[in-house]
Amino acid sequence: ERVIEFYAEHKHEIAPFELNRDHSRVTEATLAALAAPGTASTSKELPVAMISDDDEQEALRRVADLERAYDRVHGGFGDSQKFPPHSPLLFLQYAHAAGLSAQAATMVTGTLDAMMTRGLHDHLQGGFFRYTVDNDWTIPHFEKMLYDQALLLWNYSIASRLFARTGYRETAEGIIRSLEETFRVGAGYASAHDADTNHREGATYIWKLEEIEERLDPGEFDAMLREFSLSADGNFERRNHLVRIIAPGTREDNPDAARRAPDPALVGRAMDKLLAARRERDQPDRDEKVVLGWNALVGCALLAAHRYAGVETARPRAVELADYLVSTFVSAEGVAHVALGDQLQNQEFLADVGALLLFLTMLAEESAELDHRYRDTRALLEQRLASLHDDGVWMESRPTDLTAVPAEPFDQPVPSGMALAEFALLLRQIRSHEDYAPRPFADAHGRAFANLAALASRGYFYVVESPEGVAWSSLPVNSVQVFGEGRSSCYRGVCYLGLPPAPEPPNAPPAEKTKRKRRR
C-alpha cells in the first residue's frame, strides 16, 4: 500500500520502466521511439498496446451511448420489441471486467435477469426464443435460432463468473442442454426451430391452467403457482406461456422473496413432468442446415462455459465440434458455408471464416497440444481472410458468377464478419508477440462486437504467458493466454513477472474496483 501511495504521488518523477519478454529492462531508446508522435503499433520488445490517456474516456463514451438507450424498468435497450442484445452485452461485460464502468454491470445484470426470468427463456428445456413482441420480455416470437443460443451462452457464462449468481450458471447449463437435446445434428448443430407447430404460433410451448394442474400433484401445482405467473385467462391466446415471478439464483439478494419462494425440489419435479408432457406434443419443424459461422460461435460459447461457468463437459464438446467443422468445411480450395446431410454449399463468406478462426484461436489458448493441432488450419484461414480483404476493405464474399460483395460492419444480430475477423486476427497477433495497431472504438449499438478488439488492443485484456497454461479460474475474464518459457503478465502497458491479480469479489463496491484498476 505504501509503495502504491508513493507511486501515485511521485509518478511524474519516475522514469518509464517496462520489461522485455526475457524480463530485462526495456531501453530508454526503445521507449522514446514508442512515445514518438504517430507511433501506432507496439514493439516486439514490448508486446502490449500503446496506451493513450484518451482510451478510458472513449470506452466510457461507448458505455454512455448504451446507457442512454437502456430500459431501466424492464432491462434491455429501447422501448418496443425486445431482442437479446448479444454484442452490446459482451462489450459491457468486458468493459466491466476491465474496471471501466460500474453502470455497465447494472445494464448487464438488469438485462440478463429479465431475459432469463421472463418469456424469452424456455424455462422447461433451456435455451431462448428469438425476441419478444412486447417491451417487458413476456411473449416471444417462438422461433429458436442457433446463433441466439451461442451468444447467450457466451454472455451468461461470463456473467456467472463476474457476478457469481447461480442463476446465470444454471441458465448457461440450460442452453447447453437445449443445444444437445434439440439442436444437435451429428457432431454439429442445426440452424433453427420454427415458431409454429401445425401452423399455430407457440402451440408446443403454451398451457391451459387445467393442463398444468392435471399433470401435477397438489404440492407441485402450488409450487408452480408460486414460481410462475399463471392464471385461468393466461397471457397468450387464453393459455399460459411460462414467465417466472423472480429471477432464479437471485433470491440470495432478496430475503423476503426467499422466504416466500416454493421448495426448489417441488418446482424442479413439476417442471420435469411438464417437459415430459410437452415432448408428447407435436414439435416445431427444425431447419437441419449446419451453418459454419453459427456453429463456430457455439464453439466460442462452449469455451466460455468451460472457462467461466465451470461446465466440465463444455471443453471436450468444443474440441469435438472443432474437429468436425475443420474436417467438414475446410479444404485447400476454400471454406464452405452450409452442410445439409452430405451436401455442401461451397460459397465462402467472411463471417464463416472469421468465426471459425476466432474459435480455433480461442481453443489454442487451452493447451499447447490444441495450439499445435489447429496451427495449419489457422494459417489457411488467415490466407482465406487475406483473399477477402482489398486495400483496407473487407469483402463478405467473392461469388464466382457475380462481383464481390462488400462486408457490412454492423452486428445484426450475430457479430459482423468484419468484427469477427478483426478480433481473431488481433488475438493471433497478441499471442504471437507481433506488432499491432490499436483498433478504433465503434458505435456501441450497431457495432459493439468490434469494441472487444478495441479493448484488447488498448491493453484492457491481460496477456498471460506461461509454459503450460494457467487455470482459467485463476485469471480475470479479460485474459488472453500465451504459451512460452517465462511466467509474466502484461496489462495497460505494464509487464511484470507472475500472474495477474486474482479476480475480485463480484460484489465489490464500484469505487474499490476503480481503485484496483488504477493501481496496476
Enumerate the predicted regions with their spans.
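Acidic, serine/threonine/proline-rich low-complexity intrinsically disordered regions
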Residues: 99-101, 165, 255, 259, ...
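Catalytic nucleophile-loop/oxyanion-hole region of alpha/beta-hydrolase
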Residues: 168, 314, 345-347
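Long, polar/charge-rich, low-hydrophobicity segments
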Residues: 181-184, 327-353, 359-499
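Glycine-rich, acidic and aromatic/proline-enriched surface loops and short helix-turn segments
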Residues: 114-121, 320-328
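Replace the tail clause
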Residues: 1-301, 307-308, 383, 439-520
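Extended, hydrophobic alpha-helical segments in both membrane/secreted and soluble proteins
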Residues: 128, 152, 302, 314, ...
